[in-house]
Each structure stands twice: as structure tokens, then as C-alpha cells.
Amino acid sequence: MDNNKGYIMAKFNKKKLPSRHTSLGADRAPHRSFYYAMGETEKDVAKPFIGVVSTWNEAAPCNIALMRQAQSVKKGVRSNGGTPREFCTITVTDGIAMGHEGMKSSLISREVIADSAELTVRGHCYDALVGIAGCDKSLPGLMMSMVRLNVPSVFIYGGSILPGRYKGKDVTVVDVFEAVGKHSSGKMSSAELRKLELVACPSAGACGGQFTANTMACVSEAIGLALPYSAGTPAPYEERDKYAKESGKMVMQLLKKRIKPRDIVTRKALENAATIVLQ
């Protein structure tokens, strides 16, 4: 029993899990050799394999804190009897892609994210999945993959950016977008625009506005794939790492109880999510 949260340390029968195909029996000796090459022990290989996927990259601040949070997820998995297998997938960040040909890549990136996460989990026979995402299309992409795979899964949002300060007021990238319009109409000088853009985004995290990322973060809780209250904490806060670790612990409980995304993402759950978005 975990002393803090009451999680039950479960023993798993690997013969009933997908990862048996890559880790059990004499004919899987080569597979096990690969795992030993990565530092895993015989005990680790005998445990359930849990995919930990993030959309970490340096395209925008939305995703740069995700690798840190992934390490906390892995700690939660290991402390509850699993062996985490971390991997990354792509993301196209609308904040950088907007205003030029790059935006043609945005929506299709959602499908690529879903496909790539699904292929990785299926190809390596992972038993469960924790997904961490930080920008517009990556959140629905990972949640889509979870429902398609239908292995025990937990989603966690990477968190929103902190506001900047300009002329004594909180500002976000929304203010910079509006400032571009003011500048084009002659209501703001180039010097003022430069000062604003330098301070508007002071940290890691998704766009500080009610755009797709923060909206889908709310949806992730409403449909039941994310832990309650996990969407609200900004990306730089250490509390995000606590939610990440708890997500790693929770996915092990879902695996033990055989609770899968399609048990959670019901029509009622989707109606609940729609209500949240429309409010």
C-alpha cells in the first residue's frame, strides 16, 4: 500500500498481457536482450510495459516542459509495479504555423499523432499508455489514439504558460496578436510592439488563451481520461510533476482493474465534454 495515496501495489500475470509477446518464452530471448541493453533488469522485463508518450519538441513553448513531466510519470509507473517505455511523437504548433503555408500541416498533424502513438503501442505490445501533450492538435491526437487502442490509459495536459507583464498589467500572446492589428493601423509603434513581444510569453506552456489547447485540456477531464483538476496548473509549477506522477500510478490501477478508455469515454462522457465547451 502506498503510504500517501492508498494505491494498491498489484501483482500482474504477464501471461495475460500484450507484452507477453515481446518478453516471455525462450523464443523471445532476443527481445529481452534488447531490453537489457537499455538498462532494464530481469525483474523489470517481467513487469507490465507501460508506454509514456509525449509531444515534446522545441517548436514552441507549448511542449518544452513535457519531457520533464514524463520523468515523473515514469516514477509513478515504476513505484506501482510497471516498467515505463518512453517515446515521443510529432506536433505542429499552430502558434508558429499560422499565417503561412505551414498551417496546411496543422489539422493533419492530429491524425499523424494519433496514428504514430497507436503504431508504437501496437508494434511493441505495450500494456497501457500515459500521454502528455501541450498544444492544439496534440491533445486530441493522443486522446484519439487512446480510444482507438483501448488499452488502459491516462492523459495529462502539459499546462498553460504564465502571463507576462507590460505597463503594469498581465499580458499574454493574445495581446501580441491584437497589437499586430494596432500596429498595422498605426495605433502602436514598432518600438512598443517589440517591447510587448519580448515580455508576453515568459515561461514554458501552451498559449495563454482559451484556444484549442486549454479547451481540450478541459475536455480531457470532462470525458474522464485525465485526473480531476490536473488541467489547471500552469506548466512551470512543480505541482504539474505531482499530477504526472499520480497519472503514472493511476494507469497501473486501471491496468489491474482492466478499465479501458471505451469504458470511460461513453456517449454520456462526450455529452459532458460538449457541455463544458459550450458553457
Locate predicted features.
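Active-site cavity-forming subdomains of large catalytic enzyme subunits
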Residues: S106-Q279
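Gly-rich Lys/Arg/Thr-decorated short loops/hinges at beta-loop-alpha junctions or inter-strand turns
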Residues: K11-S19, I50-N57, I90-K104, E197-P202, ...
